[in-house]
Amino acid sequence: MSLRFEFIQVAMGLRERLSAVPSVHEWQVLFEFCKRQSLLGVGFAAVEKLHEVGVECPADIRLKWYGYALKIERMNEKLNMQCGEITKRYEHDGLRCCILKGQGNLLNYPESLRMRRTPGDIDLWCITPPSGLSMPNATLRDYTNYHGINAVIEYVRMQYRLQGIDANPKACYHHIDAPSMDGTKVEVHYRPAFLRSPLRNWRMQRWFEHHADECMKNKTHLGFSMMTSSVNVVYHMCHLYTHIFEGGVGLRQLMDYYFALRVWHNDVMECKDLQSQGMWSEGLGTPVMSAQEVMAVIRSFGMGKFVGAVMFVINEVFGGANENEKGQRRTWRKTDGGPQADFVGKRESSEFKQILNGGPQADDGGERKLKRINRELKENNFAPWMICEPNEKEGRRLLDEIMKGGNFGQYDTRDAALKKGGMMKHGIWKLKRVMRLVRSYPEEALWEPVFRFYHLLWRMIHR
């Protein structure tokens, strides 16, 4: 196992120590790795834990690391307060709100890591009441009643006018930038996620509309709402899938999903206990979705293969076989993420017998076939909180993208001149990236250019 992955597992409490003591150079590599993946705060927890068992990080690296960790803790305190403030203000004005990603994810982390998660901006999912919102127009003299997405967009633009900011923010298909709060970027979402395929996207929007009410009511002790655990597991998979086509994802997003899965699985177990007592669960009487139900929803969005890839990466990086992973574990045998095979095919069985009996295939070629058969028969554990079997083939591709690109693909040097060029060059870069994904996710990739044109028209209408 990679020393970098072991280091992250130590930070998460999944492993007590590393398999080898890092050299000074390796400590620098670990620091840069955590920096690229936006895991510096979490990584410093590993530095502290290793110090307790006598493994010392060089003083200069440790001091620099500590500075980053302290800054991250203060940023989390600030954003927690701001999330409560903006939720209170928006709800007072008639909107219903729910924090997405970011500070909502923070509550899924264990107490020891909660304030060490690297924060980003504030993402707020807002919906309007059925009666709409009555707001002053641009002249601030007459009032107009707005409904649905238009109401959210106009409300955000009104915030700029009320604060005296001369700006006309451009609305995207799923969100619009609101005025920042003391330097913190705020994105107001009227759609929590989206897909390029029209049919899949229609299904997704309908599903989130159906579950919006339970999320808006799911209040936390920090003064804002967050998604229920079942909806969160689906939403985060949609979020990861979207960013794969945008620029990439990093291990910070995969760690968010790991802890979201753990919280969801705990709720599933608690739900079973409560149902056996004739009670309901998930806060508001909403039943917690089972793994089969979660996968049915995700497959209806066309993301079945991608889920298997994510499960492989999580199993490889966070949830692999380590000394502290608890609970009964299921098994998977095939490397392509397909259905579990409980027997070897007739041809492989015949080859296997010939090799064992010293038959004509018991040569170098036979040895290779024997190794292949053993590899196919080998049982690999995966944790009970996973929602499907890992897909090794797609998972290795995804992990390679993550390691090359870092957080949201910011460190990806492939076609850098195109990526950082003008609008035309950036469009070519994006098309090349999408075409790399055609083999793995053909439906979404082939709809991407069409959606891009549709999005241009949509923005012209809503500017």
At which residue positions do the language-model features occur?
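Intrinsically disordered, low-complexity proline-rich tandem-repeat tracts
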Residues: 279, 339-340, 360-361
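N-terminal leader/targeting signatures
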Residues: 339, 348-351
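Conserved NTP-donor binding/palm subdomain of two-metal-ion nucleotidyltransferases/polymerases, i.e.
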Residues: 1-120, 126-132, 136-270, 278-329, ...
